[in-house]
């Protein structure tokens, strides 16, 4: 799954990592952090339920769909289908939301620049969730 090349680099098997998420979760997302540097972090995460409109104050976000498909909305625009192989990008403080389309796992590879602290989740409607109900980190490499 992970092999250290040297103290400054590594190799991750995303196809293998995306199969290791639990079948169900008590949070909206479960993630596996691959890197966690101040300048940027990289994660693989699975979505378990529709994710209400929210934003992050600290980082720009790059999301590559590595499994499944879902509906995605950025900045109150139109919903569009996000599917495997598509890269989605948005700047910090951009509102976004995700809806599941079927019962297949929806998994993303995410790069946050700079690193996004786990507490940096702000729901448009605060009643929709908290950092604790939003995401759980399954494993850090």
What would you call each of these model-derived segments?
Residues 26-28, 82, 92:
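Residues that act as N-cap/strand-start positions at coil-to-secondary-structure junctions
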Residues 1-45, 52-53, 123-141:
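A short, N-terminal "cap"/entry segment at the start of jelly-roll beta-barrel domains
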Residues 40, 49, 58, 78, ...:
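A generic "binding-loop/recognition-motif" signal
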Residues 92-120:
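Ligand-binding loop in jelly-roll beta-barrel domains
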Residues 54-55, 89:
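Short glycine/serine/proline-enriched coil/turn segments at secondary-structure junctions
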Residues 48-50, 84-85, 91-93:
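Tight coil/turn sites that cap or link beta-strands
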Residues 34, 42-46, 62, 79, ...:
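Conserved hydrophobic/aromatic beta-strand scaffold that supports enzyme active sites
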Residues 56, 62-84, 94, 99, ...:
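A short beta-strand-loop-beta hairpin characteristic of the jelly-roll/cupin
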């Amino acid at each position: 799954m992970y092999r250290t090349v040297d103290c400054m680099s590594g190799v991750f098997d995303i196809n293998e990592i995306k199969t290791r998420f639990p079948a169900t979760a008590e949070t909206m997302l479960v993630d596996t952090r691959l890197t966690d540097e101040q300048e940027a972090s990289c994660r693989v995460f699975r979505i378990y339920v529709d994710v209400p409109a929210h934003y992050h104050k600290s980082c720009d976000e790059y999301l590559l769909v590595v499994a499944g498909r879902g509906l995605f909305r950025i900045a109150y625009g139109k919903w569009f289908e996000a599917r495997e192989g598509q890269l989605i990008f948005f700047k910090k403080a951009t509102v976004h939301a995700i809806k599941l389309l079927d019962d297949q796992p929806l998994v993303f590879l995410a790069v946050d620049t700079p690193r996004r602290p786990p507490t940096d989740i702000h729901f448009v409607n605060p009643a929709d969730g908290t950092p604790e109900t939003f995401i759980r980190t399954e494993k850090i490499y």
